[in-house]
């Protein structure tokens, strides 16, 4: 379940694309881990966009800083864009986040949680 929220702006890339963009499932297949380990896709767009920092709380929720602005004013800083802090939760404990809540969407030049 995704909480209703204002539509997020499209990401703005300040650099030329040097590698092809992969879908989350394709990127997951490209990850190599040691024998006995596995990786699992827990969240992807549109549930989370432009993540720059994450932190777990005591309840097992993942707090994510989404950055739509940039810390350097010279690099595409738009006053109308706002950064967000969202909370992702795995309510059925299957390892995949199924609940998203916007905690704060009024940040500007956010750099961490």
Give the positions of each predicted feature.
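Beta-propeller domains with acidic blade repeats across secreted/periplasmic ectodomains
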Residues: 2-113
């Amino acid at each position: 379940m995704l909480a209703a929220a204002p539509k997020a702006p499209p990401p703005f890339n300040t650099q030329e694309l040097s590698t092809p963009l992969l879908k989350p499932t394709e990127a997951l297949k490209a990850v190599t881990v040691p024998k006995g380990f596995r990786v699992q896709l827990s969240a992807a767009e549109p549930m989370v966009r432009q993540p720059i920092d994450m932190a777990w709380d005591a309840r097992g929720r993942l707090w994510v800083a989404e950055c739509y602005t940039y810390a350097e004013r010279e690099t595409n800083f738009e006053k109308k864009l706002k950064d967000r802090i969202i909370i992702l939760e795995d309510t059925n404990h299957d390892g995949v986040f199924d609940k998203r809540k916007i905690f704060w969407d009024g940040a500007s030049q956010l750099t961490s949680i």
